[in-house]
Amino acid sequence: MRKFLINISYTVLPVWLFFVGMAVYLWAIDDNSGDLMRLGLIDSGPEYTDSICSHLLPEVYYTGQDDDSLLRLDTCGVLVIGDSFSHGGGVGKQGDYVNYLAHESGRKVVVFTPQDPSLSSPMQIAFDLLNLGRIDSTNVKNLVVEEVERYLVDRHCGFTTKHTSIPRVEKTEETQAATPEKSPSPLLRVKDFLFYHLFGANPILKAQLSRPVFGGVQPDVLYFYNEDVKMGFDVSPKSRQLILDCYRQVIDAARQRGVNLILLVACDKYDILQDYIVDNPYPAKTLNEDLMQWMAPDLDRFVFSKQVLSPYIEQGVKDVYLFNDTHWSPASSQLISAEIIKKLQ
């Protein structure tokens, strides 16, 4: 028996040490990796994130709210509804465009995050709050609705004007017992690493760029979500009409409530850098340009991040978007907030 256990240990011990070593490695790099690196399990090194974070604002200047019934009880200069670009995506809340918006405008800024954001899209949430009387000119002067490009078409096509109440999570024994979502443990990330790398299921794509656009160890390499080249293409006439109808419904609802509406389109990382990809094998993405054409009569309500940030990339400014993340950098957040401030009332 003893001999058998010794023989088995020669096989099991190296595997066990491999898993433990990889778990320790992934635990060590977790805090200095962006969302792309955590998904793709590619380390960008602590120096890169440290250099980006050295330019953050010293604190968070905006407030968060997840209960729509409380919006009526307070007033704010700017209410923001959005996705991860408005909720700490990138390097956290201190680097959000919303934080720069609050700091540099001198307005009270509130970010509304529904208790279950998966129930609705930013435009749907905005319409429901306006249409159901949760907000108007007496408690909200300006409303910023931010949407990331890759989900825009699907979200708009699922838009409805028929909600009679704000969608909420159905309380069941399972939801009541559910614990808050946490970051994957190192061991779970080992499982993901093996699955992605052995079976080719890595959700992160890699492309060679014609010139450096990032700082760090791979300045001319682009990592981006595979969804960036799967969603937002070949918009059918029916989908185009649904997109326009969604925008017009929200614009009309804001106008009726006396709220100044600002629409922010957060460009996909692939879209803004697609022209720099060497021998680009992926299709051209034109949704930003299409939206500008379709919504020409209301263009003054829009802030297109691609239009704001592309000139800086052309001028050679690095890290307009983060190398290790799908979001733009804190420096770009400041540029975006400046454009929004120009449209505030």
Predicted regions: what is each one?
Residues M1-Q345:
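Extracellular glycan-modifying ectodomains
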